[in-house]
Amino acid sequence: LVSTPWIELFNAFPSLLRHFPGSHNTIFKNMTEQRKFILEEIKKHQESLDLNNPQDFIDYFLIKMEKEKHNKHSEFTMDNLITTVWDVFSAGTETTSLTLRYGLLLLLKHPEVTAKVQEEIDRVVGRNRSPCMQDRSRMPYTDAVLHEIQRYIDLVPSNLPHVATQDVKFREYLIPKGTAILTSLTSVLHDGKEFPNPGQFDPAHFLDESGNFKKTDHFMAFSAGKRVCVGEGLARMELFLLLVSILQHFTLKPVVDPKHIDIAPSFKGMLSIPPFCEMCFIPV
């Protein structure tokens, strides 16, 4: 919904949109089901809660709720718990799946890149075991490909909105306290000074002359600073293990000539959505 024109109408007339037909009604239904599921899980945690031995985030939140139950201004409420769990659940699944989908599309478009990744997988991991995170440091090309996928697709072009907590002087500008700030990650990820030919998918953007992985402060796929994505470590791990596992066991085959594969996003709003594409997974 947030990456379609419907979001503009929803923001202006949230109560009316539910009466119009469209795929957004499926989204609303799914959100209701997700909220119901989360509430059921919270109730299970309430029944099994051990104040001296909390097991997870929900347990810790419930304990904090109990401690602040007499504080009328507490942010530790049931509604905030449900919303936070839903945010973590949705943000931790949709972004990773979209990145992986877009990554497979780019590898389909560039078979020469796929071949180099598979050669590195054969050399470092082999075929007789599953990949692990310790392999990543010995796979600079694969690491560069993963970074280039995230840089190129520019999954969250405008980042999430922030608010200035105090008056800030930035260069010649005064930003008053309370000002909403929307930053452009695109301007960094597609900076031509840091990434030559930023509009081209090229893993060399993250490789030095010796073929070693090259870090750069301009890689901000997860934002930066104190408000950096809290799931960055998990997302990096998931993307590496999933992509390597797929290419370890399968060769990607397009149903059309790679030259005719469209890699432009089907829609670019809050998220960059990859276009629909059919592909074949041929066991290695």
UniProtKB/Swiss-Prot annotation:
It holds the Pfam family p450. It comes from the Eukaryota. Heme binds at residue 229. It catalyses: an organic molecule + reduced [NADPH--hemoprotein reductase] + O2 = an alcohol + oxidized [NADPH--hemoprotein reductase] + H2O + H(+). Induction: P450 can be induced to high levels in liver and other tissues by various foreign compounds, including drugs, pesticides, and carcinogens. Cytochromes P450 are a group of heme-thiolate monooxygenases. In liver microsomes, this enzyme is involved in an NADPH-dependent electron transport pathway. It oxidizes a variety of structurally unrelated compounds, including steroids, fatty acids, and xenobiotics. This is Cytochrome P450 2C31. It comes from Capra hircus aegagrus (Wild goat).
